[in-house]
């Protein structure tokens, strides 16, 4: 099966008093400055039952052209600096990094 890029998926539960808006702005700023990030999406869970959510509230997804692009991102000085601040406000986290097996192309939002 052919792959279509490399994905970095992060699901988090922030600590109680975290200023999530500041973290989101920092993350958006970070990905805009590192060229190897080809796409970035994030969302806050609004629909899952608490029992199923297990406390996790936010998901972040980045796509890279390949694993080398991801490795360049993780070692970039801006990412290293941001990671320290991000880690400090995390209560729980799940990370998945994998080659993408694209079955259907992206959904285009309608106005």
From Swiss-Prot:
Signal peptide positions on this chain: none
Cofactor(s), by name: Mg(2+)
Pfam families documented for this protein: Dabb (PF07876)
Transmembrane segments: none
Presence of the UniProt keyword Magnesium in the record: yes
Top-rank taxon: Eukaryota
GO molecular function terms listed in the Swiss-Prot or TrEMBL record: metal ion binding
Protein residues bound to Mg(2+): 31, 34-35, 37
SMART domains recorded: Dabb
Stress-response A/B barrel domain ranges (all copies): 6-98
PROSITE patterns on file: S_R_A_B_BARREL (PS51502)
GO cellular component, one term: cytosol
Keywords of this entry: Magnesium, Metal-binding, Stress response
Keyword Magnesium among record annotations: yes
Main function: Involved in stress response.
Subunit text: Homodimer.
Protein name: Stress-response A/B barrel domain-containing protein At5g22580
Record organism: Arabidopsis thaliana (Mouse-ear cress)
